[in-house]
Amino acid sequence: MSPRDDIPDLKGFDGDGEGSVQVHDSEDIGLDVGGARVFSVYGQGGIGKSTTSSNLSAAFSLLGKRVLQIGCDPKHDSTFTLTGRLQETVIDILKQVNFHPEELRPEDYVTEGFNGVMCVEAGGPPAGTGCGGYVVGQTVKLLKQHHLLEDTDVVVFDVLGDVVCGGFAAPLQHADRALIVTANDFDSIYAMNRIIAAVQAKSVNYKVRLAGCVANRSRETNEVDRYCEAANFKRIAHMPDLDSIRRSRLKKRTLFEMDDAEDVVMARAEYIRLAETLWRSTGEPGLTPEPLTDRHIFELLGFD
């Protein structure tokens, strides 16, 4: 049996003749997630989105919110600092029941993590096959069928890398606000510029708007701030390159479970401020930046 034999028929998804899968509108797209406020976290691969998402979810929970975090990466490591372990993905659990979701119970694919944060790993199809957008859609449908979104105040989507194809842009179809994690360097800012363009394209037909960016693992923010000024964007948080954050990952914990060192307390406070800012942002007009051309970015941030 090949890996492709495990992939269900992707209704509403057609190949383009070049080995890829393109996403088209279908009944699965734009599912209502009830009254929850939905945030989708994007950024260059390896920039720290999962660390940001998990600590953000923890911060929301400490503000008294009922939180659900959904990891949208085949690595399924988005939530392990919240749960202390790697959990099975929705797509793998669906395979076990031959893609009959009616046979599943919430406890089969939802794990309770730090301070009551509910954790789900959507996973993804085998490399080179299927579509991540299908997996996200099926995960949201499953959560709705089990009425898990009705008792949730905040949903955080932690999305794979800086991929801006239709499949991994699927969380944008459910989100109120998109948050971009970047660093104070050319490559991650270049990726952020592309993500901004993708979000702006989705915002034509969906409610998603940009909330701003987080300068992550960066001592300075001058390059991020220069880009934001040029693109009419906004940095809403700064997470320095702290060894305590790396240690928390190694210990499989959020920052809120670490010892009260000075830098840990500072980082916790910044995550609480970020959560408060994002919560308020859904009641305000979203940002409307203008993505820069490649030439403009090179002239602004590139080497002389």
From Swiss-Prot:
Pathway: Porphyrin-containing compound metabolism; bacteriochlorophyll biosynthesis (light-independent). It comes from the Bacteria. It catalyses: chlorophyllide a + oxidized 2[4Fe-4S]-[ferredoxin] + 2 ADP + 2 phosphate = protochlorophyllide a + reduced 2[4Fe-4S]-[ferredoxin] + 2 ATP + 2 H2O. Its cofactor is [4Fe-4S] cluster. Keywords: 4Fe-4S, ATP-binding, Bacteriochlorophyll biosynthesis, Chlorophyll biosynthesis, Iron, Iron-sulfur, Magnesium, Metal-binding, Nucleotide-binding, Oxidoreductase, Photosynthesis. PROSITE patterns: NIFH_FRXC_1, NIFH_FRXC_2, NIFH_FRXC_3. CDD domains: Bchl-like. Binds 1 [4Fe-4S] cluster per dimer. One of its GO terms (biological process) is photosynthesis, dark reaction. The keyword Oxidoreductase applies. GO terms for molecular function: 4 iron, 4 sulfur cluster binding; ATP binding; metal ion binding; oxidoreductase activity, acting on iron-sulfur proteins as donors; oxidoreductase activity, acting on the CH-CH group of donors, iron-sulfur protein as acceptor. NCBIfam families: DPOR_bchL. This is Light-independent protochlorophyllide reductase iron-sulfur ATP-binding protein. It comes from Rhodobacter capsulatus (Rhodopseudomonas capsulata). The lineage of its organism: Bacteria, Pseudomonadati, Pseudomonadota, Alphaproteobacteria, Rhodobacterales. The gene is bchL.
